Amino acid sequence: MGLKLLVAPGALVPRPETELLGTTAIETLRSMNVAAPLVIDMCCGTGNLACAIAVRLPEARIWACDLTQECVDVARGNVDNLGLGDRVAVSRGDLFGALSGQGLEKAVDAIVCNPPYISEKRLEGDRAHLLAREPREAFAAGPYGLSIHMKVLKEAPVFLRPGGVLLFEVGLGQDRQVAGLFERSAAYEAVSTVANGEGEGRVVLGHSRRS
């Protein structure tokens, strides 16, 4: 998204498809007309999404978190290098556990999440090459590649304000499955999918139900 970022062996290198998640999040936040949006970047990796949102939306405050110390260190380095330390905080923890005690419950305008989304079986098969340079934690997501999506979708309503939005990056062919997870939950409404230039659904989002 036009930013120069540090990367490291313990963090996923940002992919082009993640730019679609970032631009969709920024456009959605702008359309919500929130003066000073509060944003969570879940599974932040290098912090690329948190930094991009902070640069494009100067009034936003972002809480980024990841499970591994390697990712947290790289993300903090990128935040510091871009001079965003006053608006972007990076924490280590297991999903929303990293944000306990921050006072964010029912206050967050948007949660962006680029989670691992490759099944364990595929990582042992046709996607095994991904592990040559990047950590398993960046890719592995249970038997169907959706375990993190399911956990985040379940826990996000604790933090989203009514009308707030949860946005996921998804793997090829996962868009309908993730949209179905949203639609089967009573906590969400206005579910939609955003396709890339090839017509492939790579971002799925839903809004926290207002009533």
What is each of the regions a protein language model found here?
Residues M1-V7:
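Conserved adenine-nucleotide phosphate-binding loops and their immediately adjacent elements
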Residues K4, R61, R87-A89, E189-S192:
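Conserved beta-strand segments of alpha/beta enzyme cores
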Residues P58, L84, P135, A186-A187:
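Proline-centered flexible-loop/turn and helix-kink motifs
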Residues Y117-I148:
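Mobile active-site "lid"/loop adjacent to the S-adenosyl-L-methionine
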Residues P143-S208:
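Conserved Class I SAM-dependent methyltransferase catalytic core
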